[in-house]
Amino acid sequence: MASVGPGGYAAEFVPPPECPVFEPSWEEFTDPLSFIGRIRPFAEKTGICKIRPPKDWQPPFACEVKTFRFTPRVQRLNELEAMTRVRLDFLDQLAKFWELQGSTLKIPVVERKILDLYALSKIVASKGGFEIVTKEKKWSKVGSRLGYLPGKGTGSLLKSHYERILYPYELFQSGVSLMGVQMPDLDLKEKVEAEVLSTDIQPSPERGTRMNIPPKRTRRVKSQSDSGEVNRNTELKKLQIFGAGPKVVGLAVGAKDKEDEVTRRRKVTNRSDAFNMQMRQRKGTLSVNFVDLYVCMFCGRGNNEDKLLLCDGCDDSYHTFCLLPPLPDVPKGDWRCPKCVAEECNKPREAFGFEQAVREYTLQSFGEMADNFKSDYFNMPVHMVPTELVEKEFWRLVSSIEEDVIVEYGADISSKDFGSGFPKKDGQRKMLPEEEEYALSGWNLNNMPVLEQSVLAHINVDISGMKVPWLYVGMCFSSFCWHIEDHWSYSINYLHWGEPKTWYGVPSHAAEQLEEVMRELAPELFESQPDLLHQLVTIMNPNVLMEHGVPVYRTNQCAGEFVVTFPRAYHSGFNQGYNFAEAVNFCTADWLPIGRQCVNHYRRLRRHCVFSHEELIFKMAADPECLDVGLAAMVCKELTLMTEEETRLRESVVQMGVVMSEEEVFELVPDDERQCSACRTTCFLSALTCSCNPERLVCLYHPTDLCSCPMQNKCLRYRYPLEDLPSLLYGVKVRAQSYDTWVNRVTEALSASFNHKKDLIELRVMLEDAEDRKYPENDLFRKLRDAVKEAETCGSVAQLLLSKKQKHRQSSDSGKTRTKLTVEELKAFVQQLVSLPCVISQTRQVKNLLDDVEEFHERAQEAMMDETPDSSKLQMLIDMGSSLYVELPELPRLKQELQQARWLDEVRLTLSDPQQVTLDVMKKLIDSGVGLAPHHAVEKAMAELQELLTVSERWEEKAKVCLQARPRHSMANLENIVNEAKNIPAFLPNVLSLKEALQKAREWTAKVEAIQSGNNYAYLEQLESLSAKGRPIPVRLDALPQVESQVAAARAWRERTGRTFLKKNSSHTLLQVLSPRTDIGVYGSGKNRRKKVKEIIEKEKEKDLDLEPLSDLEEGLEESRDTAMVVAVFKEREQKEIEAMHSLRAANLAKMTIVERIEEVKFCICRKTASGFMLQCELCKDWFHNSCVPLPKSSSQKKGSSWQAKDVKFLCPLCMRSRRPRLETILSLLVSLQKLPVRLPEGEALQCLTERAMSWQDKARQALATDELSSALAKLSVLSQRMVEQAAREKTEKIISAELQKAAANPDLQGHLPSFQQSAFNRVVSSVSSSPHQTMDYDDEETDSDEDIRETYGYDMKDTASVKSSSSLEPNLFCDEEIPIKSEEVVTHMWTAPSFCAEHAYSSASKSCSQGSSTPRKQPRKSPLVPRSLEPPVLELSPGAKAQLEELMMVGDLLEVSLDETQHIWRILQATHPPSEDRFLHIMEDDSIEEKPLKMKGKDSSEKKRKRKLEKVEQLFGEGKQKTKELKKIDKPKKKKLKLNVDKSKELNKLAKKLAKEEERKKKKEKAAAAKVELVKESTEKKRERKVLDIPSKYDWSGAEESDDENAVCAAQNCQRPCKDKVDWVQCDGGCDEWFHQVCVGVSAEMAENEDYICINCAKKQGPDSPGQAPPPPFLMSYKLPMEDLKETS
C-alpha cells in the first residue's frame, strides 16, 4: 500500500487489483441481459467488470466525423481531488484574509520546498493549538509530521511562520478579534499596549513569498524566492510561459510584484495634520469636527493618532496596538477592520463546477490537440507512453497544488443530437447488410435499454443519459469523478476507438463506506454541499480509500471492449489519451427492489428523481400480458409492497384529519409540478395539497410540511382508489401464476425426501418449461439447473464407471492413462447419488460396485498375509480389482507381491536346469530381485542366488586365467580344475571352454603321434594344418614347437627354391614351373591362358576319361602320397609335354610354307599377323613381334657387332618360364630338402625335375662323346681361341699407340720411348699368354644387371666360372676365359655372355680360315660399302647327328634348368648354319619408310617409341644384314609382303626387277634430305642447348622414355658413351635419320655444322658397286672410317 503524505494523500500511487474480465462465446453473446444476469453474482462483488466481445464482433463507427462538432469541458486536475480542493479553499480564505488586512500572502519555503500551511494548521490544531504546542515545545514533532528532518532548527522556524501567518487567521476564525469592539475602556487599551510592547512582531520581507490572490480564485501559488529567483534563472522564466500541454497555465509563479504603493490616508500625529486629510464624503451626515470622530473602537480613545487605522470598508478607527493580534506597523495596502473582514469572509461561496471551453472542436481538431498535449507532456510518441506511467502521473497531478494542469473533456454529449457511434435504424439512409446486423444487435447501446427484459423499456419518455446514450470524447488526463448512476441503475460503456480508458470501481456493499471516508477526509466540502458525490465533480485517490478499508478495483478498457457497472457501485476513472466512448443505463428485473431503495434514499437527501418509480411499477402492472414472466413476478412482489405501504400512508393521513380527497391523473402533470416540496420526490400514487397554495404539494411522508393550515383544509389527491389496487395486483398475479406454480413444483421437487424423490426426467421437464417461458434466472432457477446438471453428470459418471467395469481388459491393454475413482471417492459418489434431489437408474449398480470393492478389500488382505506369495491367487485378485475400474489401494501391493511370486517361480524354474543357469541369467535374476519389494522369501532366494553367482564367478575367473595363461598350463592341471568345477550347478562358459580345450589338446596330440609314428613324412600342408589348429589351443602342447619348427624350415626351403626358380612378378607358381608344361600351344594373357588350358583339359577328358588333367600335376602330387605314384605321374606329364611340343613345332614350322596366304596366319602371343621385325623362338618355332616380347639381351650389343645376330638364342616367354638355375644350385636345394622331415609337392617335383635333367645330361654327354661331335667341338674351340687372341692384340696396339703419342708431346720422356714401347708390348703379350683362364670384369654401366640376365636366360653372369669348371667335355670352349684385359678401351664386343660368345668365335674362326691368315682379316673389297659374298657354314654334320642334336636341344630347352650341354649343342647347331642365314623377319608396309626419309621431332610419342623399338632390333640384328635389308624393303602400296631367306635366288631375281623403280625414288629422297638438312641442324643446336636429345637407348627395348644426353647411347655399333662436355651429337643425312655421338664417329663440331654426314649403313646402301648408284659424296670419300667400324664391316 502506498504511503500517505502529510496532506493526507498518497505519495506514490499503487494500482488496485484488477476487476474480472469476461469473454462470452457467440452463443452467450446473443442475449446480453441474460449474460449479464449470469455474471452478476461474480461481477457485482467488484462493482465493475469488463466484457470482451468475440473477435469477429466489430461494429462500424456510425458518427459523421466531418459534421461532429462539440464544446468540451475544462478540467483543472488539482481541483478535482477532494483533499486538494480543501487545501486550495483554505489557501483562498487565508489569502483573502491577509488581503483584507492590507497584506499579500507570502508562502514560506522551508528546506527547499514550499511549506504546506494547510497541513501545518491541521497538525497544530490536532496537538491542541498554538499556545499548547509552544508551551509543551512540540514544534519539532510538528516538523517531523510534515516530513522535515529533525535537528536543523525546523521547529523554531515553523513556529515563527505559524505565528506570523496562521495565528492571526486562527484568532480571526475563533472570533477573538471581534471581542470588545464596542467596549472602549482604558484597561483594555493599556493591556493591549503592554502586549504590543512585549510581542513587537517584525515581518521579514526577505523570507516572505507573495501569493497574489485576486477576488476570483486563480489557484496560483508563489514561492518565497519568486521575485529574485525567477529573474535570475532563465529556465524558470521559460516555465512561466510553457506548461505541460496546450492548456497548462504554467507554474504557480506570478508576475513580479509592483513596487509602487497605494496612497493611503494615514492618521496624523496631531490635530492640525488631520484637517489637511481629504476625507470621503458621506451623504446624510452633519459637518462636525472630524477630530472628534477618530476614536478607537476598542478603547474609545482618540490619542496616539499615528497608531490609529481607518477601515476602508466602514471608516471605523482602531489603534494598531488595540487589534488582536496587534499590528506592528501600518499596513501599506487597503485595510479593513475585523468586523468588515468577518463580514466579507462569511459570505457564501459559489458551488464548484466545470466550466465550458471557449473553443468548439471537431473530432480531428480535438484529436490533434490531445495527441500534441500528450506527446509534449511525456516527450515521446503517444503510442509509446506506458499506461502505468500515465496512471501514476495522473494521481500525482490531482494531488499537487503547485502544478496546475488543465485538460478538456467532451463529456455527456447526447447521441440524440450528435448521432450514436453504433449504426441505428432511423430511416434517413439505407444501411449495408453488415450495418443492419449491428443495428439490430442487443449489444448496440441504443437497443439495450429498451430490450424486452429491460425495465426502462416501459418508460415512454427518452431520458437523456439513461435511455439515450451519451458520447464521451476524451484526451490524456481527462477524467470522470466518483459517482453512482441515477436511480442506482446499471450502466454499460463501449469504447469505440482510441487509447484506453482506466476505470476504478467500488462494489455496492461499500458505497456508504466510501461516502463516510470522503466526508471524514474532506468535511469542509460536504458542509456546503451535502450531495457532493452526486455532482460528479469530486475525485479521491483510490490508495487513500484503500487505506481506509474501501475495496477498490481497476481495469483498462481498450477499444472494442465493454465495461459494466452494477447498481449503486461507485466508479471513476480517466482517459489514457484521445478516444471515443459511448454509455447508457439499463435496468433488469432484479433492479426493482434496488430502485425502490434508491427513491427512499433520494427522499432523505432531498434529491430530485429522474422518473417516478411508483409510476413505472403501476404502468407495468396495468398491462401485465406484455410483461416478461420473470419481470411480472418481480412486479407482483413490488406491487404488493407498494399497495401495503400506500394503504398505511393514506390511513395515517385520514387519522390526522384530512377529510377531502380527489382523484388525479398524476402522469399528465409535469414532473416538476408534482414534486414534494419537502423531499422533492415525484409523487404518483398520492399527494397532499392545501387551498392556501394549490400549486404546492407534499407526499404523504411529509404531511405536516405542507403549510400551517388545519388538516381539514387539506385535500388528498390519489391516482387509484384503494379498492382498485387489489385488481391491479390480481392481474399481475395471474400473469405470474404460472411462474409461481413452477416455483412451487420446483421447490417441492428439490426438497423431497428420499422415498418421494422425482425422476431426473421430471426435473428436466421443469427446467425446459422455465427456459421456454423465459422465467427469471433467480436462485431457484439456477438451483434447478444445477440439480439437473449434477444429476446428469452423476449419471454420466456412473455409466462410464459401469462401462469401464465391463471393458477392463481392453482398457488395461490399451496402455492409456485413465483417472479412476478411489474408494473414498466411490463412497462419496454413492453418497452423492443418494443425496441427489432426483433418482437416476444407475444408483443400484453403483452400490453393487461398492460392495464388490469391499469384498475385494477383504480377500486382498488375506492374500497379502500368506507366508509365500501364490502367483495364481494374486493374479486372480488383480484381475478382479482391474475389472472394478476403481483406484484400489491394495492393487499396487498385490502387483508387487505378484512380481515377487513370479520372480520366485522363475528362480525355481531356472535352478531346476543347471544348463540354463548362466552368469547373465543369475545377474538378471538378482537385478530384477533387487527392484522387488522386501519379502523374506525373496531375500532368502536372493542370498542363494548371490552365493551361487559368487562361486560361479570365482571358477569362471579361474578358468579364464587358465585359458589366457602364458605360458600355457599343462593338461594335468587343467583336468584337475575341470573335475573340481563339475559340482557347480551352473552353466560356466569358461570352464566349458577349458574342457573343450582339453579335448582338442588330446585329439591334437593323438594326431601328431599318429603322424610321427607313420612310415612316411607328413606333407607340409598337414603340418601347417596341425600347427594352425594347435596354436590357438590354450593348453601346453609339447609337440607344437617341433611341428612349428618343421613348418618354418619347410616354408623357408620353399621360399628359397622360389627365389631360385621364379622370375620377378611371375604368373606361375613354383609347382607349375617345376612340373612339365600343360599349357603348350596356349597364348594370351594369364586369364585367357588359364581358360584355354581348362578347355584343353575338358577335351582331353572327353577323349580319354582315364587320363588325368594336363595342368593338374600338382593335384596329382598332392593326392599321391606314395613316392612311386608321384614319379609315375611326373613321367606321364613329361611324355605329354614332349608330344605337345612336337606338335606345336610342326604347326609353327608349317606356317612358313604358306607364303601366299601369310597375311591370314596368326603369330606371336598377341595372335596377330606378321608385321615389322619378328623373332623366332628356338623351342616352339613360332614368330613373335619385337614389340610384344622382350628382346634377348647380349653383353656385347652396346658396341654392336654385325655378326652377333647368329649368336642370339631367343626363347619366348611362354617357353622360358623361370630363371633356369644351374644344376649345382638345384643339387644344394635337394640336399637341404633331404634334411627336412617334411614332404613338399614342390620338393618331389624338384626331385623329378632333377632326375629328368640328369637323365637328359647323360644322354647329351653320350651324344657329344661321339667322334663326330667331339671333333666339331675341338674345331670350334681352336677357332675361338685364335679370334680372341687376334682381337686382343689389335686393341693392345691401339692403346700403345695412343700412349706413345702422349709421350711424344713431353720432351722429358722422348729418350725413354723405345724402352717404354718394348716393355709395354711385352707386358701385353705376356699377359695374354700367361693368363688364359682369368675372367674379365664386366662394366656395370654398359651391361644389363645380373637380375635381368637371370630373369631372361636362367643363369647368373657370376656363375661363369662354375659353368667352365663343370664342363667335363671341353674346358677351353669359352672365349671369355682367354684374355684378362681390364682396360675399358678394349673392344668389349668380344666379351659376351656365355650363351653367345662361342657363336662369335665360331664366326671369326670361319672367316679367318677362309683368308688363310693367322690373324683375322677382312675380305678384300673395293669399298667398305660393298657387301661380301655369301660364306659356307663353319661345321657340317651328318643328318642323323644333326637330328639327334636337334631333338636333344628341344628336350633340353624344355627343362627349366641351365646345363652346359645345352650350350655346347647350341653352338654346334649354330655352326652348322650359314653365317648369313636369317632368323628374323622384316615386313615392310606401304611407303612409310621410303616416302619419309627425314623423321622430325614433331612425331607423337607412340611413333617415337615404335621407332626406338625398331632401332633396337636393327642394332641387334641388322648390321650384319645390310645386304638383305634392301631385299626386304619391297614397295608394294597396299599389301604387306613377307620375305623369307629360304630361297636366296628368288630374292635376287625380284631385286633386279625393282632396282629401276628404286633408283628414281632414292633420288627424290636425297633431294628431300638436302632440302631439310638445315632444319635438322637447327633442331640439333636446340637439343644441344637443352642437353636432352630424343635419342633412344639401344638397351631400352621396352620402349621407356628417353634418357638424358650423358647416359644416352648413340646408333654407332661401338658407342663410347661420353660424359658431360663431350656429349655432342650429329644426325645422319643419308636417310636413316639416326643420331651419333661426334666422338664415336670421329666428327668434329665444325665438320658436323658445315658438311653432311652419312653413316656406314647409308653408305653401304649408296656404294659405288651397287647398280645404278651415284658415287659417294666428297665428305664420305675423304673421311677415314674409325678402325672399329672397319672391323665391323669385315
UniProtKB/Swiss-Prot annotation:
Pfam family, one: JmjN
JmjC domain sequence ranges: 437-603
Chain positions of motif GSGFP motif: 419-423
GO terms under biological process: circadian regulation of gene expression; facultative heterochromatin formation; male gonad development; negative regulation of transcription by RNA polymerase II; protein modification process; spermatogenesis
Phosphotyrosine carried by residues: 1595
Region spans: Disordered: 203-229, 1327-1346, 1407-1435, 1662-1690
Cross-link (Glycyl lysine isopeptide (Lys-Gly) (interchain with G-Cter in SUMO2)): 191, 1007
Residues annotated as binding Fe cation: 483, 485, 571
UniProt GO MF annotations: chromatin binding; chromatin DNA binding; enzyme inhibitor activity; histone binding; histone H3K4 demethylase activity; histone H3K4me/H3K4me2/H3K4me3 demethylase activity; transcription cis-regulatory region binding; transcription coactivator activity
Family designation: Belongs to the JARID1 histone demethylase family.
Description of its domains: The GSGFP motif is required for the interaction with SUZ12. The ARID domain specifically binds to the CCGCCC motif and is required for the lysine-specific histone demethylase activity. The PHD-type 3 zinc finger is required for the interaction with histone H3 di- and trimethylated at 'Lys-4'.
Record text on subunit structure and interactions: Interacts with RB1, ESR1, MYC, MYCN and LMO2. Interacts with SUZ12; the interaction is direct. Interacts with BMAL1 and CLOCK. Interacts with HDAC1; this interaction impairs histone deacetylation by HDAC1. Interacts (via PHD-type 1 zinc finger) with histone H3 unmodified at 'Lys-4' and (via PHD-type 3 zinc finger) with histone H3 di- and trimethylated at 'Lys-4'.
Protein name: Lysine-specific demethylase 5A
Organism this protein belongs to: Mus musculus (Mouse)
Gene name tied to this protein: Kdm5a
